[in-house]
């Protein structure tokens, strides 16, 4: 091959590579709208994207079903206004079809683990009658301190609060504990926990149960928790419990409290 032909061939290949690179760059720009970076799903789950929208204080948390990371910021949840527990989505939980179907052929307790700040992120379980535990059996068990815990001496308003209650088979470690007020834990979370426990006892059916804490940004104490339950049929719950205590102001970033 002559030197001229060889140079012409190399020149054609170079033009082809440049053209390909330009086309690829244009495609990427069109797909991502010029905002190339980490891709995060918007919403508590992709199937219910419409329920949650992006906010300034969004936090990435591990979604417990193994489907990756989801961005949720609770903007569909109204600001706390006297009602410490509210019903969402007409009490219909946000479970996927696959999650509901897991009631039929599997039994599990799955925890989302702790995020980069050491906070518990989520817990989901198929709770059966065999998982129910009498509360008396927990006496003497020492619980670790979750993030934001400042002890009972500073205001005396906190409990080490289980995501999945001990009486429903939940474990006693930091994957399943958050700092919650006594009112939040003992008065309002127990309402949903009691409903689940009573239904399982009376019906003998298993219940799909999920509790997800909501944090603002890097705050250590959750603003509240989303509690969902379903037997796959008539028994359903979808409640949000606010982590507040009458007469006190909470610094959710540190856990410090001040009496009003």
Give the location of each predicted region.
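Alpha-helical protein-protein interaction elements
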Residues: 21-24, 44, 62-64, 72, ...
